[in-house]
Amino acid sequence: MVLNPSKYQDTRTWKMTPAMIRARKPFFKGNMLGLTLLLGVTGSVYYYTYHFLHKDNDFADVPIPPIDPQELEALKKEYEAKKKA
């Protein structure tokens, strides 16, 4: 499938012709404003989600029981054995 050459592009370099550049010029500022608005809203949603909803303290009130060193060594050996298998 061969693309037909556009009259708004140079057939040798595929760059826009001066006519195409002139046709797009009035829309440039509006497009940049829309892009800025879209990126701003998206960034704001991500910022809000990460910073305000990321405060995960569900288990902050659950105390962690102390563990003695022998039990810790036994758990480490068990973990290493499962890791190798």
Swiss-Prot record:
It is found in: Mitochondrion inner membrane. It comes from the Eukaryota. One of its GO terms (cellular component) is mitochondrial inner membrane. It is a single-pass membrane protein. InterPro entries: Coa3. Required for assembly of cytochrome c oxidase (complex IV). With COX14, negatively regulates COX1 translation and is involved in MSS51 association with newly synthesized COX1. Component of 250-400 kDa complexes called cytochrome oxidase assembly intermediates or COA complexes composed at least COA3, COX14, COX5A, SHY1 and SSC1. Interacts with COX1 and MSS51. Present with 2530 molecules/cell in log phase SD medium. Belongs to the COA3 family. This is Cytochrome c oxidase assembly factor 3, mitochondrial. It comes from Saccharomyces cerevisiae (strain ATCC 204508 / S288c). The gene is COA3.
